[in-house]
Amino acid sequence: MSKEENIEMQGVVIDTLPNTMFRVELENKHIVTAHISGKMRKNYIRILTGDKVTVELTPYDLTKGRIIFRSR
C-alpha cells in the first residue's frame, strides 16, 4: 500500500490506553484508536491527554490509525 492512499486527519488525544495506544477524537467528531509511529517511538516523543496530533488512517479500517505527528 502506498502513502498516497492513506488519509491524514487532525485530532485531540482524549484517553491513554495500555501498550502505547491512544483514543483520539478527530475533527469530524469520530473517535479512533491509534498507536505511535515507529519514528516517534524511536525518538521518545511523549504524548499526553489533550495533545493535538496528526493521525494517519487507512481507507480499509477507519476505526484504527497511526499517530505520525504531535503539535505543540
From Swiss-Prot:
Question: Which UniProt key words apply to this protein?
Answer: Cytoplasm, Initiation factor, Protein biosynthesis, RNA-binding, rRNA-binding
- GO function terms (MF aspect): ribosome binding; rRNA binding; translation initiation factor activity
InterPro entries hit by this protein: NA-bd_OB-fold, RNA-binding_domain_S1_IF1, S1_domain, TIF_IF1
Keyword Cytoplasm appears in the UniProt entry = yes
- The question of whether Cytoplasm is a record keyword is answered with yes
Classification via Pfam families: eIF-1a
Subcellular location(s): the record lists:
Cytoplasm
**Mind telling me which GO cellular component terms the entry cites?**
cytosol
In this entry, which stretches build a coiled coil? none
**CDD domains registered for this protein in UniProt:** S1_IF1
Q: Which residues form the S1-like domain?
A: 1-72
Primary location recorded for the protein, binned into one broad class: cytoplasm
Role this protein plays: One of the essential components for the initiation of protein synthesis. Stabilizes the binding of IF-2 and IF-3 on the 30S subunit to which N-formylmethionyl-tRNA(fMet) subsequently binds. Helps modulate mRNA selection, yielding the 30S pre-initiation complex (PIC). Upon addition of the 50S ribosomal subunit IF-1, IF-2 and IF-3 are released leaving the mature 70S translation initiation complex.
Describe the subunit structure. Answer: Component of the 30S ribosomal translation pre-initiation complex which assembles on the 30S ribosome in the order IF-2 and IF-3, IF-1 and N-formylmethionyl-tRNA(fMet); mRNA recruitment can occur at any time during PIC assembly.
Which family does the entry's similarity section mention? Answer: Belongs to the IF-1 family.
Which protein, by its recorded name, is this?
Answer: Translation initiation factor IF-1
Organism classification, top ranks?
Bacteria, Pseudomonadati, Pseudomonadota, Gammaproteobacteria, Enterobacterales
